[in-house]
Regions:
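Domain-level signal for Mg2+-assisted phosphodiester chemistry and nucleotide/NA-binding surfaces
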Residues: 1-97
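Extended two-metal-dependent nuclease catalytic cores across DNA- and RNA-processing enzymes
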Residues: 20, 48-49, 76-267, 271-283
Length: 284
């Protein structure tokens, strides 16, 4: 299967075109970039990996409810940005709805879940049933899912990746935290990224070289123990609530794809996407 990190991949391609190619953000541009990112992935991977699953974010997510500072800085930066994020999200929702009506892909969205949770559940399931699978995403968090059957394609690098030791990589992520998601390293307090210009407490490579291989976690102090478990809960995809994981797999199993080429044509023509309609077979 092809697991597409829907909004993240589409937004990344938009940002590249906006910054490097000087494109102007309009409804037409956003629709084109969203659909073209889907078309490109489908054309590139369908023969080897089969059907595509569009993995979507729900408007609410359990991590934000569990950790109030989750993606705090990212959300703040968006509010202060010149980019019309409302337009982007409106177009993402619109395309998601249209895909469900006639495009030949599975759309999986689960209440209170991010696309990460869906990819985590289906990536784990793919390894269990030994189904060759590619995760299309730039996100380093998905390295933990790599296996004999699951690899990752990073569009930003135009390259496949399969980490030789996903568990070790995951542990390093937990120790270092994830600044992009507002998760500090294990030496740093929860609210660190809410304070402009403040530096995290240093993580020294000589310590990491020891800690990574300490399965007993004996290096944890009272100060860092709670922070380690905080990061583990937010980064390790096996900590996704079981009801979300189960629902994602069930939706994958029961979802029926009903491609409807006439409806796809109607959609392209109505939205003046003639250039994509000329490549309609790439979507099939």
């Amino acid at each position: 299967m092809i697991l597409l990190d829907y909004s993240a991949v589409a937004i990344a391609s938009m940002m590249i075109s906006l910054k490097l190619e000087g494109e102007k953000l309009t409804d037409f541009f956003a629709l084109h970039m969203i659909l073209n990112s889907i078309r490109t992935s489908n054309k590139r991977f369908k023969r080897e990996f089969g059907k595509m699953v569009i993995c979507c974010d729900h408007e609410r997510n359990w991590r934000k409810e569990s950790f109030q500072y989750y993606k705090y800085k990212r959300n703040k930066d968006k509010k202060n940005s010149d980019v019309d994020w409302n337009l982007i999200y409106k177009c993402l929702d619109f395309v998601q709805d249209e895909i469900d009506k006639g495009f030949p892909y599975l759309v999986v969205e689960v209440p209170n879940a991010e696309a990460d949770d869906i990819i985590g559940a289906l990536g784990t399931y793919a390894t269990e049933i030994k189904e060759p699978t590619v995760i299309v995403s730039n996100d380093k968090d998905f390295v933990q899912l790599h296996s004999e059957y699951v690899c990752q394609y990073r569009p930003c690098e135009s390259a496949f990746t399969r980490h030789p030791n996903p568990k070790l990589h995951l542990k390093e992520l937990i120790l270092r935290g994830d600044g992009d998601d507002g998760i500090p390293n294990i030496k740093t307090a929860d609210d660190h990224f809410t304070i402009e210009g403040k530096r995290q407490k240093s993580m020294y490579q000589k310590d990491l070289d020891v800690w990574l291989y300490d399965d007993e976690l004996s290096f944890l102090t009272d100060e860092t123990k709670e922070n380690y478990y905080r990061n583990e809960r937010l980064i390790d995809l096996s900590f996704t609530p079981e009801d979300i994981r189960s629902e994602a797999v069930v939706k994958y199993k029961i979802c029926k794809v009903r491609p409807n080429k006439p409806k796809m044509t109607q959609f392209f023509m109505k939205n003046k996407l003639r250039n994509l309609h000329e490549k309609i077979n790439d979507f099939m």
